[in-house]
């Protein structure tokens, strides 16, 4: 069995968020061998099925995703589970928690990272 981990970073935008998160994760573990597969602007079920098919063919696949469309995120999670591929959403729980704390519904819009003025209270 190969000890090279196949890391799938799936985003509905540029993938910058996932890249930074995986950088933080891999800093916590010494001596891991991995290959990154980056999929940006993933916004359809068909795209997800193609990615999952590829991930299933490889050993040691792990999926990290940042997809703000909740139905598409659930689709990815459900299909990953069916294929027994570990899959972790990095934004869903945070968006839900902030929505509750701020007493606002999240827009669930995917945005390309742009500079925005910092707001201070």
Which residues does each predicted region cover?
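N-terminal accessory targeting/assembly segments
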Residues: 1-25
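Short, surface-exposed connector motifs at secondary-structure boundaries
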Residues: 3-6, 32-34, 56-62
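Structural signal for conserved beta-strand scaffold positions within catalytic alpha/beta enzyme cores
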Residues: 9, 38, 89-90
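Helical mechanochemical/support elements of P-loop NTPase systems and associated helical scaffolds
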Residues: 14-18, 47, 72
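Short, solvent-exposed amphipathic alpha-helical segments in soluble enzyme
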Residues: 23-28, 79-82
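A short beta-strand-loop structural module common to alpha/beta enzyme folds
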Residues: 31-43
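Extended, charged alpha/beta regions that create polyanion-binding interfaces
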Residues: 43-45, 52-112
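Single conserved hydrophobic/aromatic residue that forms the stacking wall/gate
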Residues: 112-121
């Amino acid at each position: 069995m190969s000890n090279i981990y196949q890391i799938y970073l799936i985003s509905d935008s540029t993938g910058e968020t996932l890249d930074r998160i995986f950088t933080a994760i891999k800093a916590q573990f010494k001596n891991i061998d991995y290959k990154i597969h980056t999929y940006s602007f993933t916004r359809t079920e068909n795209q997800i099925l193609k990615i999952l098919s590829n991930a299933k063919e490889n050993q040691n696949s792990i999926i990290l995703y940042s997809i703000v469309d909740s139905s598409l995120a659930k689709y990815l999670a459900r299909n990953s589970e069916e294929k027994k591929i570990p899959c972790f959403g990095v934004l869903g729980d945070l968006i839900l928690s902030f929505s509750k704390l701020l007493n606002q519904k999240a827009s669930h819009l995917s945005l390309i990272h742009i500079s925005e003025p910092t707001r201070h209270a």
